[in-house]
Protein backbone atom coordinates (compact mmCIF):
# COMPACT_ATOMS: atom_id res chain seq x y z
CA UNK A 1 0.00 0.00 0.00
CA UNK A 2 1.31 3.45 -0.91
CA UNK A 3 0.07 6.76 0.40
CA UNK A 4 1.05 9.68 -1.79
CA UNK A 5 0.44 13.21 -0.44
CA UNK A 6 -1.13 15.35 -3.14
CA UNK A 7 -1.07 18.68 -1.38
CA UNK A 8 -3.44 21.01 0.39
CA UNK A 9 -6.70 22.14 -1.16
CA UNK A 10 -8.18 25.45 -0.02
CA UNK A 11 -11.93 25.56 -0.54
CA UNK A 12 -13.98 28.72 0.08
CA UNK A 13 -17.28 28.21 1.90
CA UNK A 14 -20.05 30.60 2.85
CA UNK A 15 -20.95 33.67 0.82
CA UNK A 16 -23.37 35.68 2.92
CA UNK A 17 -22.15 39.19 3.74
CA UNK A 18 -18.87 38.72 5.59
CA UNK A 19 -15.66 37.48 4.05
CA UNK A 20 -15.72 33.81 3.15
CA UNK A 21 -14.36 31.31 5.63
CA UNK A 22 -11.68 29.04 4.19
CA UNK A 23 -11.32 25.37 5.03
CA UNK A 24 -7.96 23.77 4.37
CA UNK A 25 -8.46 20.14 3.46
CA UNK A 26 -5.61 17.71 2.96
CA UNK A 27 -5.74 14.75 0.61
CA UNK A 28 -3.60 11.63 0.58
CA UNK A 29 -3.64 9.51 -2.58
CA UNK A 30 -3.88 5.85 -1.51
CA UNK A 31 -2.96 3.19 -4.06
CA UNK A 32 -2.06 -0.50 -3.91
CA UNK A 33 0.98 -1.96 -5.66
CA UNK A 34 -0.86 -5.08 -6.91
CA UNK A 35 -3.05 -2.94 -9.16
CA UNK A 36 -0.37 -3.07 -11.90
CA UNK A 37 0.85 -6.63 -11.29
CA UNK A 38 -2.07 -8.66 -12.68
CA UNK A 39 -1.59 -10.70 -15.87
CA UNK A 40 -5.14 -11.65 -16.87
CA UNK A 41 -4.03 -13.85 -19.78
CA UNK A 42 -1.74 -15.88 -17.52
CA UNK A 43 -4.46 -16.05 -14.86
CA UNK A 44 -6.94 -17.38 -17.44
CA UNK A 45 -4.51 -20.09 -18.55
CA UNK A 46 -3.85 -21.07 -14.94
CA UNK A 47 -7.59 -21.22 -14.21
CA UNK A 48 -8.11 -23.50 -17.21
CA UNK A 49 -5.32 -25.79 -16.00
CA UNK A 50 -6.76 -25.89 -12.48
CA UNK A 51 -10.25 -26.76 -13.69
CA UNK A 52 -8.88 -29.43 -16.02
CA UNK A 53 -6.81 -30.92 -13.18
CA UNK A 54 -9.99 -31.10 -11.10
CA UNK A 55 -11.71 -33.07 -13.85
CA UNK A 56 -13.97 -30.22 -14.98
CA UNK A 57 -14.75 -30.07 -18.70
CA UNK A 58 -14.10 -26.53 -19.94
CA UNK A 59 -15.37 -27.22 -23.45
CA UNK A 60 -19.12 -27.09 -22.85
CA UNK A 61 -21.30 -24.09 -23.76
CA UNK A 62 -21.58 -23.21 -20.07
CA UNK A 63 -17.91 -23.60 -19.11
CA UNK A 64 -16.07 -22.50 -22.25
CA UNK A 65 -15.56 -18.98 -20.88
CA UNK A 66 -15.28 -20.01 -17.24
CA UNK A 67 -11.47 -19.65 -17.01
CA UNK A 68 -11.70 -16.06 -18.28
CA UNK A 69 -14.54 -15.29 -15.89
CA UNK A 70 -12.58 -16.80 -13.00
CA UNK A 71 -9.52 -14.72 -13.85
CA UNK A 72 -11.53 -11.49 -14.00
CA UNK A 73 -13.39 -12.31 -10.79
CA UNK A 74 -10.24 -12.98 -8.79
CA UNK A 75 -8.55 -9.92 -10.29
CA UNK A 76 -11.45 -7.80 -9.06
CA UNK A 77 -11.24 -9.34 -5.59
CA UNK A 78 -7.56 -8.42 -5.21
CA UNK A 79 -7.56 -4.96 -6.84
CA UNK A 80 -8.67 -2.14 -4.53
CA UNK A 81 -9.64 1.17 -6.07
CA UNK A 82 -7.29 4.08 -5.51
CA UNK A 83 -8.83 6.91 -3.52
CA UNK A 84 -8.06 10.25 -1.90
CA UNK A 85 -8.10 10.07 1.90
CA UNK A 86 -9.33 13.60 2.54
CA UNK A 87 -8.92 15.12 6.00
CA UNK A 88 -10.23 18.39 7.37
CA UNK A 89 -9.04 20.50 10.31
CA UNK A 90 -11.04 19.88 13.47
CA UNK A 91 -12.01 23.54 13.77
CA UNK A 92 -15.09 22.78 15.88
CA UNK A 93 -12.98 20.95 18.45
CA UNK A 94 -15.13 17.81 18.23
CA UNK A 95 -13.75 15.35 20.77
CA UNK A 96 -16.32 12.54 20.88
CA UNK A 97 -16.35 9.24 19.04
CA UNK A 98 -16.73 9.12 15.26
CA UNK A 99 -18.07 5.69 14.31
CA UNK A 100 -19.10 4.09 11.02
CA UNK A 101 -21.07 0.89 11.62
CA UNK A 102 -21.71 -2.11 9.40
CA UNK A 103 -19.28 -1.23 6.61
CA UNK A 104 -19.45 -4.15 4.14
CA UNK A 105 -16.37 -6.39 4.09
CA UNK A 106 -15.49 -8.87 1.36
CA UNK A 107 -12.09 -10.48 1.13
CA UNK A 108 -10.29 -13.72 0.29
CA UNK A 109 -8.96 -16.10 2.90
CA UNK A 110 -5.31 -16.43 1.95
CA UNK A 111 -5.20 -20.04 3.16
CA UNK A 112 -7.87 -21.41 0.80
CA UNK A 113 -8.56 -18.47 -1.57
CA UNK A 114 -12.23 -18.67 -0.60
CA UNK A 115 -14.24 -15.55 0.24
CA UNK A 116 -15.12 -14.25 3.65
CA UNK A 117 -17.76 -11.56 4.03
CA UNK A 118 -19.20 -9.52 6.84
CA UNK A 119 -19.19 -6.04 8.33
CA UNK A 120 -16.66 -3.73 9.94
CA UNK A 121 -17.34 -1.18 12.67
CA UNK A 122 -14.66 1.51 12.55
CA UNK A 123 -14.32 4.44 14.90
CA UNK A 124 -11.84 6.96 16.23
CA UNK A 125 -11.53 9.75 18.77
CA UNK A 126 -10.37 12.80 16.78
CA UNK A 127 -7.34 14.82 17.71
CA UNK A 128 -7.49 18.60 17.76
CA UNK A 129 -5.90 18.61 14.31
CA UNK A 130 -7.80 16.48 11.80
CA UNK A 131 -10.98 14.58 11.02
CA UNK A 132 -11.44 12.20 8.10
CA UNK A 133 -14.10 12.45 5.42
CA UNK A 134 -16.79 9.98 6.49
CA UNK A 135 -16.87 7.94 3.28
CA UNK A 136 -13.13 7.33 3.60
CA UNK A 137 -13.61 4.92 6.50
CA UNK A 138 -15.38 2.57 4.10
CA UNK A 139 -12.71 3.18 1.46
CA UNK A 140 -9.95 2.21 3.90
CA UNK A 141 -11.79 -1.01 4.81
CA UNK A 142 -12.15 -1.86 1.11
CA UNK A 143 -8.50 -1.02 0.45
CA UNK A 144 -7.12 -3.51 2.94
CA UNK A 145 -9.80 -6.15 2.26
CA UNK A 146 -9.09 -6.31 -1.50
CA UNK A 147 -6.22 -8.79 -1.25
CA UNK A 148 -5.65 -12.28 0.15
CA UNK A 149 -6.10 -11.77 3.87
CA UNK A 150 -6.62 -13.17 7.31
CA UNK A 151 -9.24 -11.41 9.38
CA UNK A 152 -6.90 -10.69 12.28
CA UNK A 153 -4.40 -8.86 10.06
CA UNK A 154 -7.15 -6.99 8.22
CA UNK A 155 -8.45 -5.64 11.53
CA UNK A 156 -5.06 -4.39 12.69
CA UNK A 157 -4.13 -2.91 9.29
CA UNK A 158 -7.23 -0.71 9.27
CA UNK A 159 -6.59 0.45 12.83
CA UNK A 160 -2.88 1.07 12.25
CA UNK A 161 -3.55 3.12 9.10
CA UNK A 162 -5.98 5.39 10.93
CA UNK A 163 -3.63 5.71 13.87
CA UNK A 164 -0.71 6.66 11.63
CA UNK A 165 -2.45 9.10 9.32
CA UNK A 166 -4.92 10.81 11.68
CA UNK A 167 -2.91 10.80 14.92
CA UNK A 168 -6.20 10.33 16.83
CA UNK A 169 -6.60 9.93 20.58
CA UNK A 170 -7.99 6.45 20.02
CA UNK A 171 -8.99 3.96 17.31
CA UNK A 172 -11.35 1.00 17.40
CA UNK A 173 -12.02 -1.60 14.70
CA UNK A 174 -14.32 -4.61 15.04
CA UNK A 175 -14.96 -7.03 12.17
CA UNK A 176 -17.66 -9.72 12.11
CA UNK A 177 -17.34 -12.12 9.19
CA UNK A 178 -18.45 -15.49 7.88
CA UNK A 179 -15.70 -17.54 6.26
CA UNK A 180 -16.69 -19.86 3.44
CA UNK A 181 -13.59 -21.95 4.16
CA UNK A 182 -15.50 -22.91 7.34
CA UNK A 183 -19.03 -23.06 5.91
CA UNK A 184 -18.52 -24.71 2.50
CA UNK A 185 -15.81 -27.21 3.38
CA UNK A 186 -14.15 -28.88 6.34
CA UNK A 187 -16.25 -28.45 9.46
CA UNK A 188 -19.11 -26.86 7.39
CA UNK A 189 -20.13 -24.64 10.30
CA UNK A 190 -22.92 -22.80 8.48
CA UNK A 191 -23.92 -19.60 10.25
CA UNK A 192 -20.76 -19.37 12.34
CA UNK A 193 -19.14 -15.93 12.43
CA UNK A 194 -15.72 -14.78 13.56
CA UNK A 195 -15.26 -11.53 15.48
CA UNK A 196 -11.91 -9.72 15.70
CA UNK A 197 -11.08 -6.38 17.28
CA UNK A 198 -8.22 -3.93 17.56
CA UNK A 199 -8.29 -1.03 20.03
CA UNK A 200 -5.60 1.63 20.21
CA UNK A 201 -4.97 4.64 22.42
CA UNK A 202 -7.80 5.75 24.69
CA UNK A 203 -10.17 3.10 23.33
CA UNK A 204 -7.73 0.46 24.53
CA UNK A 205 -6.60 2.03 27.79
CA UNK A 206 -9.78 3.61 29.17
CA UNK A 207 -12.45 1.04 30.15
CA UNK A 208 -15.35 3.51 29.83
CA UNK A 209 -14.33 4.65 26.35
CA UNK A 210 -13.83 1.04 25.28
CA UNK A 211 -17.25 0.05 26.65
CA UNK A 212 -18.91 2.99 24.86
CA UNK A 213 -17.34 1.96 21.56
CA UNK A 214 -18.42 -1.67 21.92
CA UNK A 215 -21.96 -0.62 22.91
CA UNK A 216 -22.32 1.69 19.92
CA UNK A 217 -21.18 -0.99 17.48
CA UNK A 218 -24.13 -3.14 18.55
CA UNK A 219 -21.91 -6.19 19.06
CA UNK A 220 -23.61 -8.72 21.34
CA UNK A 221 -21.28 -9.45 24.22
Model-found features: residue ranges?
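A domain-level signal for the structural core that forms small-molecule/cofactor-binding pockets
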Residues: 1-221
Amino acid sequence: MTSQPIGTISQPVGTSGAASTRIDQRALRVVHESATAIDLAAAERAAAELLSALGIDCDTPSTRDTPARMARAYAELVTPRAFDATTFPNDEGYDELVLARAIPVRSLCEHHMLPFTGVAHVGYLPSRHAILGLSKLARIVEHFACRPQVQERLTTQIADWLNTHLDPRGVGVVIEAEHTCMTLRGVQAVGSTTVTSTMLGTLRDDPRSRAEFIALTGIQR
